[in-house]
């Protein structure tokens, strides 16, 4: 049995972000502005259900407590419910989450919960339907809002909403978002726009620091909360007058990487030690058969020896991440 995943800087890893597809049906300006472009290779190139079962088991036995399914849009997988159920076979995984654009939420969220999904993040970059359409390329604002309501109706106590913070788009809309979460158990997370290989011009035009939002929150009496060991990187704030919470994810902030607790596996089976790192470590040759489980765990744990102390975003180096659908953000 390999001990808890730990790197050379004594960081422990409890959280796996597992991409199950690169495909997305939205065309968000900061991610896939031209829509998903198939690369013409094998349509079965994404991890199969059995491969997902094996990789999740390996991580569970290495101390992983939380798995987040990402994409692309994970719910476009026809076997998405089966994937949820397969990962929930691991009792060590206490939290199983998905990040979704909300397109299929209203229709399917009850099935996801029944299969074992425990947490939900929905991407909503604007509360104005026309602006939502302009950002995503899809006139689906009402459908996504109905999906969030459906999540509450089927038993989710809280929903997280991801909002990419952009100058001249939504950075001046804090009060609108605060009004929305005042009586809703939503954790609204502002995520700083990150530079990717394909998004340099957009980054220069729209990047704004989350510090702007933090100062406004502190001035209005919001209090920062402690983070659990398997939580993501958000700084979370609460206020006694609000049912909802605000999260801030600021990857350009000093020491952002000090508390890194997460690893990534891409939809084609490569282990990525950082969202903005270089080429991943291939795992797929060890996912074909249950007999390779111990070798798989050794490759995962051994790979951590090469994890860098920090990303290099401040230097304009986004590694191999051409867009955020590639590894799953």
From Swiss-Prot:
<dbReference type="GO" id="GO:1904047">
    <property type="term" value="F:S-adenosyl-L-methionine binding"/>
</dbReference>
<feature type="binding site">
    <location>
        <position position="99"/>
    </location>
    <ligand>
        <name>GTP</name>
    </ligand>
</feature>
<feature type="binding site">
    <location>
        <position position="123"/>
    </location>
    <ligand>
        <name>S-adenosyl-L-methionine</name>
    </ligand>
</feature>
<keyword id="KW-0342">GTP-binding</keyword>
<feature type="binding site">
    <location>
        <position position="68"/>
    </location>
    <ligand>
        <name>GTP</name>
    </ligand>
</feature>
<dbReference type="GO" id="GO:0005525">
    <property type="term" value="F:GTP binding"/>
</dbReference>
<dbReference type="InterPro" id="IPR000385">
    <property type="entry name" value="MoaA_NifB_PqqE_Fe-S-bd_CS"/>
</dbReference>
<keyword id="KW-0408">Iron</keyword>
<keyword id="KW-0501">Molybdenum cofactor biosynthesis</keyword>
<dbReference type="GO" id="GO:0051539">
    <property type="term" value="F:4 iron, 4 sulfur cluster binding"/>
</dbReference>
<comment type="pathway">
    <text>Cofactor biosynthesis; molybdopterin biosynthesis.</text>
</comment>
<keyword id="KW-0456">Lyase</keyword>
<feature type="binding site">
    <location>
        <position position="31"/>
    </location>
    <ligand>
        <name>[4Fe-4S] cluster 1</name>
    </ligand>
</feature>
<feature type="binding site">
    <location>
        <begin position="262"/>
        <end position="264"/>
    </location>
    <ligand>
        <name>GTP</name>
    </ligand>
</feature>
<dbReference type="InterPro" id="IPR006638">
    <property type="entry name" value="Elp3/MiaA/NifB-like_rSAM"/>
</dbReference>
<dbReference type="InterPro" id="IPR013785">
    <property type="entry name" value="Aldolase_TIM"/>
</dbReference>
<dbReference type="InterPro" id="IPR007197">
    <property type="entry name" value="rSAM"/>
</dbReference>
<keyword id="KW-0547">Nucleotide-binding</keyword>
<comment type="function">
    <text>Catalyzes the cyclization of GTP to (8S)-3',8-cyclo-7,8-dihydroguanosine 5'-triphosphate.</text>
</comment>
<dbReference type="GO" id="GO:0061798">
    <property type="term" value="F:GTP 3',8'-cyclase activity"/>
</dbReference>
<feature type="binding site">
    <location>
        <position position="17"/>
    </location>
    <ligand>
        <name>GTP</name>
    </ligand>
</feature>
<keyword id="KW-0949">S-adenosyl-L-methionine</keyword>
<keyword id="KW-0479">Metal-binding</keyword>
<feature type="binding site">
    <location>
        <position position="72"/>
    </location>
    <ligand>
        <name>S-adenosyl-L-methionine</name>
    </ligand>
</feature>
<feature type="binding site">
    <location>
        <position position="30"/>
    </location>
    <ligand>
        <name>S-adenosyl-L-methionine</name>
    </ligand>
</feature>
<dbReference type="GO" id="GO:0046872">
    <property type="term" value="F:metal ion binding"/>
</dbReference>
<comment type="similarity">
    <text>Belongs to the radical SAM superfamily. MoaA family.</text>
</comment>
<feature type="binding site">
    <location>
        <position position="160"/>
    </location>
    <ligand>
        <name>GTP</name>
    </ligand>
</feature>
<dbReference type="Pfam" id="PF13353">
    <property type="entry name" value="Fer4_12"/>
</dbReference>
<feature type="binding site">
    <location>
        <position position="194"/>
    </location>
    <ligand>
        <name>S-adenosyl-L-methionine</name>
    </ligand>
</feature>
<dbReference type="GO" id="GO:0061799">
    <property type="term" value="F:cyclic pyranopterin monophosphate synthase activity"/>
</dbReference>
<keyword id="KW-0411">Iron-sulfur</keyword>
<dbReference type="Pfam" id="PF06463">
    <property type="entry name" value="Mob_synth_C"/>
</dbReference>
<feature type="binding site">
    <location>
        <position position="24"/>
    </location>
    <ligand>
        <name>[4Fe-4S] cluster 1</name>
    </ligand>
</feature>
<dbReference type="InterPro" id="IPR050105">
    <property type="entry name" value="MoCo_biosynth_MoaA/MoaC"/>
</dbReference>
<feature type="binding site">
    <location>
        <position position="274"/>
    </location>
    <ligand>
        <name>[4Fe-4S] cluster 2</name>
    </ligand>
</feature>
<dbReference type="GO" id="GO:0006777">
    <property type="term" value="P:Mo-molybdopterin cofactor biosynthetic process"/>
</dbReference>
<protein>
    <recommendedName>
        <fullName>GTP 3',8-cyclase</fullName>
        <ecNumber>4.1.99.22</ecNumber>
    </recommendedName>
</protein>
<feature type="binding site">
    <location>
        <position position="257"/>
    </location>
    <ligand>
        <name>[4Fe-4S] cluster 2</name>
    </ligand>
</feature>
<dbReference type="InterPro" id="IPR010505">
    <property type="entry name" value="MoaA_twitch"/>
</dbReference>
<keyword id="KW-0004">4Fe-4S</keyword>
<feature type="binding site">
    <location>
        <position position="260"/>
    </location>
    <ligand>
        <name>[4Fe-4S] cluster 2</name>
    </ligand>
</feature>
């Amino acid at each position: 049995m390999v001990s808890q995943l730990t790197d050379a800087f004594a960081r422990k890893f409890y959280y796996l972000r597992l991409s199950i597809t690169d495909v997305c049906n939205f065309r968000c300006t900061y991610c896939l502005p031209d829509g998903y472009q198939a690369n013409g290779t094998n349509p079965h190139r994404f991890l199969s259900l059995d491969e997902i079962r094996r990789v999740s088991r390996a991580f569970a036995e290495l101390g992983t407590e939380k798995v987040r399914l990402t994409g692309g849009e994970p719910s476009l997988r026809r076997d998405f419910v089966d994937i949820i159920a397969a990962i929930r076979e691991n009792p060590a995984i206490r939290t199983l989450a998905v990040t979704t654009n909300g397109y299929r939420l209203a229709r399917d969220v009850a099935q996801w919960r029944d299969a074992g999904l425990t947490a939900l993040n929905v991407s909503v970059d604007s509360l104005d339907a026309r602006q939502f359409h302009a950002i995503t390329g899809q006139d689906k604002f009402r459908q996504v809002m109905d999906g969030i309501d459906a999540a509450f109706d089927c038993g989710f106590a809280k929903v997280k909403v991801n909002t990419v913070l952009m100058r001249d788009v939504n950075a001046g809309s804090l009060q609108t978002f605060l009004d929305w979460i005042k009586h809703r158990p939503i954790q609204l997370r502002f995520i700083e726009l990150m530079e990717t290989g394909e998004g340099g011009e957009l980054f220069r035009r729209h990047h704004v620091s989350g510090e702007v939002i933090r100062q406004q929150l502190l001035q209005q009496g919001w209090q920062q909360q402690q983070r659990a060991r398997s939580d993501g990187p958000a700084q979370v704030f609460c206020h006694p007058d609000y049912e909802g919470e605000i999260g801030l994810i600021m990857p350009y902030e000093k020491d952002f990487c000090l508390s890194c607790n997460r690893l990534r596996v891409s939809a084609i089976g490569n282990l990525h030690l950082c969202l903005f790192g270089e080429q991943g470590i291939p795992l797929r040759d060890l996912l074909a058969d249950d007999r390779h489980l111990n070798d798989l765990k050794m490759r995962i744990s051994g790979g951590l020896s090469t994890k860098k102390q920090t990303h290099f975003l401040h230097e304009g180096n986004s590694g191999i991440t051409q867009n955020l659908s590639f590894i799953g953000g």
